[in-house]
């Protein structure tokens, strides 16, 4: 919990895997495939994370750090529409306290929206230290069920580099919680169940015995619509 970090000195995940092939609340299935929750938990356990929380009409931006020294960095908050156009961009030099949760900034909802519809906008919150991105999170003004999500069109190119296979993914419009899969194959993607923001390209490693050509021909996507 970003507000009560000092109360929690360890985390227990229940449960990680299954001993039989059924639908369940485990974060990996019987065949060791990662479910969405497992990707999320991996990212939540990074050494430094940013998180956002709506407090009425105010957006509070937090950083949670496990480091034992203070971090000096830059907080970048960008509001985008679902076509990838920048609505507003704010930047601020910040200090992240050691081994605790820190409120970095608070912003008003209306100032972020700039007159746009909250059902058609998203926030990208990024914490940088020099040229290194410590963490980046996406946030929304309303629940996903209330978003006016567009119909995206994907570009997916499979390739191989230094013996590692990958896919390069982009979209013309926002695609939420995109799941990559290949039917009938035991395959691992380094990232999955992610938001694809228009104007960006995502390189995702693919652990499989399939060739890039086979990946290209057989890969499928699902997303929230």
Label for each model-derived stretch:
Residues 116-128, 209-225:
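Short, surface-exposed ligand- or partner-binding patches at beta-edge/loop junctions that are enriched
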Residues 1-170, 175-191, 196-204:
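Carbohydrate-binding surfaces of carbohydrate-active enzymes
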